């Protein structure tokens, strides 16, 4: 049986700091496993000979598991408690990592997708536990600041993930190899692609082993069981006649906001390599751009930590970020001008995609406390509904891929404009709705 939960206000300052540190490590792991998809997409596109649409099944397989497993994850956590549930989540992720081994040995894209789906299932359990945990681990007014710290850990791992993957898997001769693939005889090409794809065997064997070990570590960590569903007298009275989660409009609208936010975020990171390649940049140069997007996100998180709530409220920052997303979305598809920055010579629109990282940075942190406000005993189920919104990462990139195949990789960015328009609506009006 899980340990009896306690209220966050009953934790000592030391317990609170330890809890935040442990959750920060979890968010680092979330980021590393999630954002490595940015380099897996072009890698599988070459190694498994895929179209844009087929390549973006990477994000679909990974994130659709959030839709499938978030509700079961909430029920699992109720039965097991946070720590045992997190242990199970890590072990499910480990199984997904180990599936990469037979997938690579046979160069079977379907098995890779199965591994990604399983990794996502484990992450669904961990995210369902960690997000409400960090939200209630202190005053509601500073929740965005705590989530910003978690975001730095998440996106810091995301900066490292594609660079580490590229350093481990790619060789300096691969640019020449990629150029020669089109002229190779079928047997020679198959052998070259087999060798390329099998380079993931050792890295993912190590990842799987590490995830197994982390499951044991989190189970026996000093992380306390917190009551995330505590109701004050006012909340209990307001929710007395509530029988289900659909009776909280601000939550449902917030979950839709999460769906659109994460979809737009993953598009900005996972499509920027192909977009850079469309401008003539080789893969080994373009691989740096996801890290630039995530660096812009971290700049946004640091801004939030410094300014919220002392200078501006988390709601004001949410409104600023969503409005900035609208402006950048329009500029990406309408502005055309060559620009040289650092060692890169590209179109200016590529840097507008990079700046989307800043626009995306405080949106997640702003939506969560607004959507969970006043849920009381419905908090765990509400959190699982919010996590289900992460399937936006699965669906919107497929829409981008379809548009890229039928129009262009630049015009496909029109798909994110309605996302930011809705998020602006939620920041201004939608979060206030308490009745349908």
Task: Indicate residue ranges for each PLM-predicted region.
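C-terminal ends and interior cores of transmembrane alpha-helices
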Residues: 91-106, 323-342
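Extracytoplasmic
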Residues: 18-46, 130-131, 161, 268-276
């Amino acid at each position: 049986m899980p340990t009896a939960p306690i209220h966050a206000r009953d934790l000592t300052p030391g317990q609170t700091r330890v809890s935040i540190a442990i959750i920060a490590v979890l968010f680092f792991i979330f980021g590393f496993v999630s954002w490595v998809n940015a380099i897996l997409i072009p890698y599988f596109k070459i190694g498994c000979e895929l179209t844009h649409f087929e390549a973006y099944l990477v994000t679909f397989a990974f994130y659709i598991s959030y839709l499938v497993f978030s509700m079961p994850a909430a029920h699992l956590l109720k039965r097991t408690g946070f720590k045992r549930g997190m242990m199970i989540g890590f072990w499910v992720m480990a199984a997904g990592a180990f599936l990469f081994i037979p997938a690579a040995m046979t160069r079977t894209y379907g098995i890779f997708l199965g591994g990604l789906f399983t990794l996502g299932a484990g992450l669904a359990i961990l995210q369902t536990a960690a997000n409400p945990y960090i939200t209630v681990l202190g005053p509601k007014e500073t929740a965005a600041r705590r989530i910003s710290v978690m975001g730095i850990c998440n996106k810091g791992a995301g900066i490292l993930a594609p660079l580490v993957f590229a350093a481990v898997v790619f060789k300096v001769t691969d640019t020449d190899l990629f150029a020669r693939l089109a002229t190779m005889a079928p047997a020679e090409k198959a052998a070259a692609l087999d060798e390329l794809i099998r380079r993931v065997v050792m890295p993912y064997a190590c990842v799987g082993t590490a995830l197994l070990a982390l499951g044991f570590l989190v189970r026996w960590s000093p992380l306390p069981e917190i009551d995330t569903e505590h109701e004050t007298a006012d909340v209990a009275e307001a929710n007395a006649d509530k029988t289900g989660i659909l009776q909280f409009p601000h939550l449902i609208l917030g979950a839709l906001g999460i769906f659109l936010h994460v979809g737009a975020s993953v598009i900005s990171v996972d499509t920027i390599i192909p977009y850079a390649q469309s401008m003539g940049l080789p893969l080994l140069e373009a691989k740096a751009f996801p890290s630039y997007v995530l660096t812009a996100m971290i700049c946004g998180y640091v801004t939030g930590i410094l300014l919220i709530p002392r200078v501006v409220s988390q709601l004001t920052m949410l409104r600023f970020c969503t409005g900035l997303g609208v402006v950048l979305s329009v500029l990406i598809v309408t502005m055309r001008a060559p620009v040289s920055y650092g060692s890169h010579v590209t179109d200016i629109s590529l840097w507008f995609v990079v700046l989307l990282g800043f626009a995306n940075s405080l949106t997640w942190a702003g939506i969560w406390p607004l959507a969970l406000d006043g849920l009381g005993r419905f908090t765990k189920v509400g959190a699982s509904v919010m996590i289900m919104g992460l399937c936006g990462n699965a669906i919107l990139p497929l829409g981008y891929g379809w548009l890229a195949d039928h129009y262009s990789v630049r015009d496909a960015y029109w798909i994110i404009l309605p996302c930011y328009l809705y998020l602006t609506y939620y920041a201004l009006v939608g979060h206030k709705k308490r009745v349908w």
